[in-house]
Swiss-Prot record:
Cleaved signal peptide residues: 1-25
Domain notes: DOMON domain could bind catecholamines and thereby could regulate the cytochrome b561 domain function. DOMON domain could bind one heme b.
Species in which this protein is naturally found: Arabidopsis thaliana
BP terms from Gene Ontology: cellular response to hypoxia
Compartments it resides in: Membrane
Domain of life, per lineage: Eukaryota
Residue span(s) of domain DOMON: 49-164
Binding residue positions for heme b 1: H211, H278
Biased composition (Polar residues): 173-183, 380-404
Cofactor note: Binds 2 heme b groups non-covalently.
This protein's UniProt keywords: Electron transport, Heme, Iron, Membrane, Metal-binding, Signal, Transmembrane, Transmembrane helix, Transport
Protein's recorded name: Cytochrome b561 and DOMON domain-containing protein At5g35735
Taxonomic path: Eukaryota, Viridiplantae, Streptophyta, Embryophyta, Tracheophyta
Length: 404
């Protein structure tokens, strides 16, 4: 090797290294040139999804001209960027949305105020003025342009950006993992500072999922199964049915209270967001279930003159709780908007429980009537009077009068 080439080679390597470090140290948004010769005072490489935000803040009139860029987009995807004045979650976000209109085959932009987790990004006005809204899709890169008329409390705000599929001409749910759950942060249009959101939205999603699972299992599965134990097992085994009934109901109540508490926590963490029907049904369920628990403490003896009234109360509140719980679980599905498989999985559980009822109801009546025709008790002989619900601890007229 020619030794005279070594210094030149070393110098070239050093220069190449410095060039790479310089390019890597320079914000990618600073190197972008817009085809329409627009120029912006500040820009930020956003922390997720490979997106960029360019803006110019006009302090005199309180407006911000922005350009949001998202590369690697297909014609069957939607892209959105927005501000949330109260939190880093999706609900409450004032968004700019862009995707290809399948009817006109034109790439369009519009505004959408996100009011629920099941949103389809419907067109709606925002809490602040927007002018000059437009969007382009060039070589797989979406750019949304707009001028925002911001109040002082929005000069520093939470920003969120997202991408998802378009299905049948309508924006569908985005992915709930990876960068899609990290695409939020803070933006200060005046100072030009932007920071990552720290994954808060992912934590909220986990809390919502936990809330949904706890309530679906407790109110939607364990409670109905506990009622079925009391209604259908009593003719076969006493006091086994009683212990199973109590075990299912108490387990359902404990898990349900945990789910209810997570719902309260989610509500407190989401100011300005309210699902009044879902919340009110949840409060009613908690109240009814708590009344059922305390009712057990004042349950009259089987031969007490008020036992019949207690049974009517216990049945009415119990079945009302089960019906309301199923209704509220589907309300929760509408709010959380999970993949369809979860909704269908719960529907499958309800169908299974319903099939069990259709089989056990006539079977129970058959056993009750046969025992009655033979002059015997309609329930299995109890080992203790505390498990019996008939008048004076003897027979009942059928399964409708049985309870814990």
């Amino acid at each position: 090797m020619d030794r005279t080439q070594s210094p030149k080679t070393a110098l070239f390597a050093v220069l190449a290294t410095l060039l790479v470090l310089t390019v890597n140290g320079q914000s990618l948004c600073n190197t972008h040139r817009f085809t329409n010769n627009l120029a912006f005072a500040d820009c930020s490489d956003l922390s997720a999804l490979g997106s960029f935000l360019h803006w110019t803040y006009n302090e005199q009139n309180g407006t911000v001209s922005i350009a949001y860029r998202h590369p690697g987009t297909s014609a069957s995807s939607w892209v959105a960027w927005g501000l949330n004045p109260s939190s880093t979650q999706m609900v409450g976000t004032q968004a700019l949305v862009a995707f290809t209109n399948t009817t006109t085959n034109q790439f369009q932009a519009y505004t959408s105020s996100v009011s629920s987790y099941g949103t389809r990004l419907e067109r709606s006005s925002l809490s602040f003025g927007v002018s000059g809204l437009s969007a382009t899709l060039v070589s797989g890169e979406v750019t949304i342009f707009a001028t925002l008329e911001l109040s002082p409390n929005l000069i520093t705000a939470n920003q969120l950006w997202q991408v998802g599929p378009v299905v049948n001409g309508v924006p569908a749910s985005h992915q709930t993992s990876g960068d899609n759950m990290r695409s939020s942060g803070r933006i200060d249009f005046r100072t030009g500072q932007a920071s990552a959101g720290g994954g808060g939205s992912g934590d909220r999603l986990r809390k919502r999922n936990t809330h949904g699972v706890l309530n679906a299992v407790s109110w939607g599965v364990l409670m109905p199964m506990g009622a079925m134990m009391a209604r259908y097992m009593k003719v076969f085994a006493d006091p086994t049915w009683f212990y199973l009934h109590i075990a299912f109901q108490v387990s359902g109540y404990v898990i349900g209270v945990a789910g209810w508490a997570t719902g309260i926590k989610l509500g407190n963490d989401s100011p300005g967001t309210s699902y009044s029907t879902h919340r009110n049904l949840g409060i009613a369920l908690f109240t009814f279930a708590t009344l059922q628990v305390f009712a057990l403490l004042v349950r009259p003896k089987p031969d007490h003159k008020y036992r019949t009234y207690w049974n009517v109360y216990h049945h009415t509140v119990g079945y009302t709780t089960i019906i309301l719980s199923i209704v509220n679980i589907f309300k929760g599905f509408d709010i959380l908007d999970p993949e369809d498989k979860w909704r269908w999985a719960y529907i499958g559980i309800l169908i299974f429980l319903g099939a069990c009822v259709l089989i056990l109801e006539p079977l129970t009546w058959f056993i009750v009537l046969r025992r009655k025709s033979r002059g015997g008790n309609t329930v299995a002989a109890p080992t203790s009077s505390k498990y019996s619900n008939g008048v004076n601890g003897t027979t009942t007229t059928g399964p409708h009068h049985q309870d814990a």
